[in-house]
């Protein structure tokens, strides 16, 4: 990344901003303080208010009109072109009248529905509805035949029983008391409308009125649909174009200039300088100055990884985005995490299940069904933790992880704890000491690799003390690990003939400690035990594998004993234990290796070189769905 400054005549401000937007490779920043003092804020755009007014109007159009597919992309050559097209669509009066009428009809239909809900309980009775309301009393339906009528005795109310409800009539000044008592016993009240006629006749009349209102509503919606057929595609295109223009106007606040010139600064990828320079020179007719800005500012972070690796950027961003000058560890995470995960699962049955679940999640997110058969409680809980796209990314990351688990499970001959293959390459219990040793070597390798990356990074940043500190920790870690391994394999000796590796290890420790003290001083001595713990922490790769295998085998053992017990009850219980026990262990096989695998990378590895706390590179651009880049390099906007 490098910071650039563009200085050009004020008359080219709009085409320059359009060019930068359509290129989409520059994060525009506030001007540096030393330059800012020499310049004034940029003039406000003369068209700003017009753009915002039209944008508000067209957003309203798009929200009100029925949705229609947008099959084409529009190309606008200038802001004037956009405003000209926007001025041709003036359907304010049509939409306002239609919406007001629609709201009135909806309110009337709601009122009719409310009246019908009360009258439904009176259907079939031969009395006039008007007898239940007067100047000094009101009546209500209690739609519950099991309600305790005695609770209303203090109201001196008239109560008339119906088939499935009661009618209660009270004095007008007792309606609040009625509501209070009804709330206290959990009874619902429905006010009887002030109407005349027998219930069946009134119901028929109200249904006729509702049918007429429904017909009027359909006519309004048809009218809105006709407007949508005619204008929706163009409205969506103009709305998107106006949003882009509004974004360009907003960025003008970061510009500085004089009466005749303006200046803009920002970050671009280093390999985009030529592209930006060519485009700006073209729109200004070579009447501009484009230069790089030397600065000690930390640049924003642009992550660039192959498509299949980029999905693991999710995990890096979750932890902390690397600084702009830092090494991007996404590739390392993408290679190491699946291996750690698969080794800790170590069962090809669980690996196959995780693979199928991952594929199901990806398909489900891409093709959501009209009606889900997954319990709503589970789906809500999952979506509360992660968005659908995050869930899809996690599922994609688990595909290579599950494949490694399948391979490891085939080697260990583990299928949900059963040894169903006719061969076993490595029996987990038989090779346990070797697995522990391999995990230790993996830990040493990861820690050493982390310090090497930190050493290179400090040298790149010309931090000599930091580089010496990393080198000291590297020597100390290798020295301690060498002595520890020699303790396991051989007697600890320091003779030249039999213990040369120990002498080298001690020398590395002796050299490493002063190098650590150069930067960290006494704090370094406190941190030394943590290096040993970081290396040993990788033994959890084997620990979690053994735990998973043991739990699966215990579940299988209980199941097998129940089957041979000659008891139907025990056999059924054994099947239940097998199913739910394996489901529980499968959940553990997803979460525990996932959490611990990520932790080994985040804590034990990243801490050796990674700073994080970077800021995302956010170039000045927009995602276009309905429009094309409209920049004409020969004309101003």
Swiss-Prot record:
Record membrane topology: Multi-pass membrane protein
GO biological process: vacuolar acidification
GO cellular component: plasma membrane; proton-transporting V-type ATPase, V0 domain; vacuolar proton-transporting V-type ATPase complex
Keywords, alphabetical: Cell membrane, Hydrogen ion transport, Ion transport, Membrane, Transmembrane, Transmembrane helix, Transport
Principal localisation: membrane
One MF annotation (Gene Ontology) recorded for this entry: proton-transporting ATPase activity, rotational mechanism
Transmembrane segments: 342-362, 403-423, 436-456, 471-491, 498-518, 541-561, 568-588
Places the protein is found: Cell membrane
PANTHER family tied to this protein: V-TYPE PROTON ATPASE SUBUNIT A, VACUOLAR PROTON ATPASES
Job of this protein: Component of the A-type ATP synthase that produces ATP from ADP in the presence of a proton gradient across the membrane.
Entry's family note: Belongs to the V-ATPase 116 kDa subunit family.
Protein name: A-type ATP synthase subunit I
The species this protein was found in: Thermoplasma acidophilum (strain ATCC 25905 / DSM 1728 / JCM 9062 / NBRC 15155 / AMRC-C165)
